[in-house]
Amino acid sequence: MMNKLIGILSIIALIVVVLSIITWNNNMTMEMQNSKNETSITNETSAEKETNTTNETEIVNEANTTSEEEIKSSNSQTGQSQESATVIQPKKGQPIKEFEIVAKESEIEFKQGITLPVWTYGGTVPGTEIRVTEGDYVRVNLTNTLVVPITIHWHGYPVKSEMDGIPGYTQDAVLPGESFTYEFSADYIGTYWYHSHQESSKQVDMGLYGALIVEPKVKPDIDKEFTLIFDEWMEEYEEDMSMSMPNDNTNDTMNMDNESNTSETSGMNENNPEMEEEKMMKELYNIYTVNGKSGELISPLAVNIGDVVKLRFINAGYRSHGIHIPGQVVKIVSTDGQNIMGAEEIKDQIITIAPGERYDVEFVVQSDQSFVIDVHDENLYNDQLKIPVVVDGESDKILVEDITKELLNFDLSGYGSYSEGQFTIDQEYDVEQGIELNSKVDNNKLEYTINGTTFDESQPITIKTGDIIKLTYENKSLVDHPMHLHGHFFQILSKDDIPFTGAPIWKDTLLIKPGEKYVIAFKADNPGNWVQHCHELHHASAGMMQKIIYSDYKSSYTPDPNNTVNKPE
């Protein structure tokens, strides 16, 4: 009996020993894994710090795959002064393109003998080009070394609302010395651009903008491609561009001193405040640039006979420009990043590009004759915007056209292959809103208005996810208003009550000239807090801006009502 008991106890002891060994092995395995994970995080952080130190303006990472856990770890290790809202994550296996952009002061020679101080994204004007491929996950780490708060707005690109870069509305402005990370998925191909939306009329004026190009996965048959960004500069920058009325003598001419505090300005004579302001702006802005260079400093475009050439035009300035590509048979293949079905060949027509707009133009070089892309504008500075196109290196045989010659104006309303668009004039809409664009003088200050009110006073347009919205714009003022809608593409339905008859035209920025009426439609498919505004940014800063709010959306950002730094106009 005793021997039997001893045997049982021996078996129990053996089992205990085995269990102890198993437990010890498991603990060792977990410790080794934890140690490995800590080493991985440490290495990742060290590499990231090294990258941030040595690569301020260039692409710094193109990892093929990154797990969600690594993304969260990376975000937690960046040392950002302001927490960036994480509203999306890369999909498993989604390529990641990461950019480091440092906002910094610099000096740029715009014109021979004229060098000006500028604010830049990455030390150049235009700023660092962000070029990605359809399907990429894009991460842009912005560091602000300027003396002013800034943001980045992705003009025309439907990012999530938290990434839209509107200070005091979707985020706080990025203060000097702080950083912010913008993230979005590159789901829409085309030509876009980015710029600061903090005091944008001043900051874009100072150079805070750059190109955003999303290429298709399947590369088109293009031999040469050029991005051309138009802008205007003041040789002597005016700090106060607040749209105050001109000096006392001009006020006497306009008889403003005896006017009431508030008055509408439409329908007045040539001494109308709007026209006086336009005249003043033309005098102040006296340097016109392409890619930050004017006149003889503009780099020639080198092409060869037979090349398929793509030109991406972006207007980052405050004035519209009439672009002419002389002697070439061209196709306008997209506007505001949106392809035009059945793009037709045209020749020697003026393509008007308004502030904020983009046009992609393609043509085949069919002659060895070098030529100059010029502009047909109503100003004194057309000679500053001549872009040489040198064919087969023949730079001494450039044909220069007469820029005073009258040419046809390109018309989008009947361009491309007709097909029924997503929306029609007569269908039912969930929300219909009239948008009257005008101006008024209030306390001797010129203000630009939407439906009679400025941004601070305006009533938002309230929509909800899934709504179909129709907006009718009427320009009752005497100056152009290129209206820009954030977060959405819209279809143009009609101009001056005449329906569009060509391909469906989709845009995010629309030039509305004095007296014109446009009807557009879009679907509420990007929940968030958005705005629309005039992209003559001086007009936006003077009040022509309006909120568009999704009633079924709750933002992760809560603005501080006591914050006086954020200035979204």
Give each language-model segment a name.
Residues 225-307, 314-317, 440, 448:
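Acidic-aromatic/histidine active-site loop/patch
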Residues 216-230, 236-239, 392-415, 552-565:
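Low-complexity, Pro/Ser/Thr- and charge-rich linker/hinge segments at domain boundaries
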Residues 1-14:
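N-terminal Sec-pathway targeting helices
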Residues 88-108, 226-248, 268-273, 414-443:
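Predominantly extracellular/luminal regions of secreted and cell-surface proteins
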Residues 163-166, 172-175, 273-411, 497-501:
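Histidine- and aromatic-rich segments of cupredoxin/plastocyanin-like copper-binding domains
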Residues 27-90, 239, 244, 249-266, ...:
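N-terminal, intrinsically disordered, polar/charged segments of Gram-positive cell-envelope systems
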Residues 98, 102-215, 320-351, 371-383, ...:
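Histidine- and aromatic-enriched segments that form or immediately flank copper-ligand environments
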Residues 20-33, 286:
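Hydrophobic single-pass membrane-insertion segments
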